[in-house]
Design a protein with these regions (language model features):
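Membrane-interfacial, low-structure loops and terminal tails that flank and connect transmembrane helices
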Residues: 1-8, 158-184, 323-328, 332, ...
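Loop-to-transmembrane helix junctions at the membrane interface
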Residues: 69-90, 240-263
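Hydrophobic cores of alpha-helical transmembrane segments in multi-pass inner/ER membrane proteins
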Residues: 56-66, 139-156, 227-238, 298-315
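Alpha-helical transmembrane segments of multi-pass integral membrane proteins
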Residues: 17-28, 89-100, 138-147, 179-202, ...
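Short, membrane-exposed interhelical loops at transmembrane-helix boundaries
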Residues: 115-129, 214-216, 280-296
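Transmembrane-helix bundle segments that line or gate the permeation/cavity pathway
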Residues: 2, 11, 15-40, 45-113, ...
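Transmembrane alpha-helix entry/boundary detector in multi-pass membrane proteins
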Residues: 42-56, 210-231, 292-300
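Membrane-helix interface motif
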Residues: 27-39, 102-118, 196-210, 270-283
């Protein structure tokens, strides 16, 4: 029987907390999808959003699977990419909320509560939803984000321990380095455009926004724009530090975590806003029409995040290949589950010479494990 470490217990508690935090949101979405207008002031408006509700239900269901993968044995055997991509998006979406919500609360404390559109008050929030819906949804997102990201950090610390211990200078000077730097330059240009546009909107600018959206724009929306502007700058700054090997003695995990979170935010929120505004095809009020600048910024935001992901993936795959050894481990001493290579070396030493003779199939399997474990 395997003895659980304190980190294992925290990881398990965080993962199950994340699963529990999805229940209110999934229940609410399921009610809406089945025609129950709970917390909805305008049922006709909700009927137009069935596709968005279906998509968000699926996204939160994926979050449940991610949380389970961090504590179940099959999660340690799952291909890295199968877990990394959805978790990258989840980190970006939920991480942005975790940053924006406290800032919005601080703004409320400093400047007072906002009045509802039209100067009224009452219990109706934006979009025809009751205020309690936003408390349930974003309260759940906050708990889910903290718990899921905590579970993932502990999972990654075990599975990719060698990668997280390495330094920027350990990245190889590969033949694709010129391409990586070129793509990073494109990402930087796009990111600066995104940061400028989002910063302008955060400061109160209205050019490029739907007229009605600009008139009824909440303080929270401005805070979100400001956070995304910062994320755009942070993502490319971290990426440039990696591809140009800035301060090679520095731990790789610092720019890696920044690039991971910020690029995930750009990709996740850019994609989400394109979907939300793109699914509204029946626009009867000209003031709701979306100008061309807004989807252009969202597309640039999505592409920036995607470029950071691609360049980062190339760099890490090449690092994995450079650190792989013939016995199926990485030269930094970690295996697929992050344990020391020596743990398996002792077992191999007890085998007979015939048992230690690798077959072509086992060699391929161990090499694949080495690539994954090293990066």
């Amino acid at each position: 029987m395997t003895t659980k470490t304190p980190a294992d217990r925290v990881r398990g508690a965080a993962a199950w907390t994340a699963v529990a935090a999805t229940v209110p949101y999934l229940t609410l979405k399921l009610l809406w999808l089945t025609g129950h207008q709970v917390g909805v002031d305008d049922p006709a408006e909700m009927d137009k959003l069935w596709l968005v509700n279906l998509l968000t239900f699926g996204m939160d269901a994926i979050a449940v699977l991610l949380a389970l993968s961090f504590v179940r044995p099959w999660g340690r055997r799952a291909p890295a990419g199968l877990l990394a991509f959805p978790m990258w998006v989840a980190t970006g979406l939920l991480g942005t909320i975790l940053v924006a919500l406290p800032l919005s609360a601080l703004a409320t404390l400093l400047f007072g509560a906002e009045k509802a559109p039209g100067g009224g008050s009452g219990n109706q929030g934006p979009g025809g939803l009751d205020d309690w819906v936003f408390v349930v949804v974003y309260g759940g997102f906050s708990v889910q984000g903290l718990a899921l990201i905590t579970a993932f950090l502990l999972y990654a610390g075990r599975r990719w321990a060698g990668l997280l211990r390495s330094r920027i200078g350990d990245l190889p000077d590969s033949p694709t380095l010129t391409l990586q730097r070129a793509l990073s330059g494109v990402a930087a240009v796009l990111a600066l455009g995104v940061a400028a546009a989002r910063g302008y909107w955060a400061a109160g600018g209205a050019t490029g926004l739907p007229v009605l959206f600009a008139e009824e724009r909440s303080r929270s929306a401005a805070v979100l724009d400001g956070v995304i502007a910062v994320m755009a700058v942070a993502a490319v700054t971290a990426l440039l530090a990696l591809v140009f090997r800035a301060r090679p003695e520095r731990r790789l995990r610092v720019p890696l975590v920044v690039a991971w979170t910020a690029a995930g935010s750009l990709f996740g929120w850019g994609s989400w806003q394109l979907v939300v505004f793109g699914t509204v095809t029946d626009v009867t009020d000209p003031r709701k029409a979306v100008p061309g600048l807004m989807p252009l910024v969202e597309t640039a935001q999505l592409l920036t995040g995607l470029l950071v992901l691609v360049v980062g993936a190339i760099a890490l795959v090449e690092r994995a290949a450079a650190h792989a050894t013939t016995d199926g481990t990485a030269t930094d001493g970690t295996t697929i589950d992050g344990t020391a290579a020596a743990a398996r070396a002792g077992t191999r030493g007890a085998q007979t010479p015939a048992a230690r003779t690798p077959t072509p199939r086992s060699t391929v399997a161990r090499t694949t494990a080495a690539v994954e474990s090293a990066g």
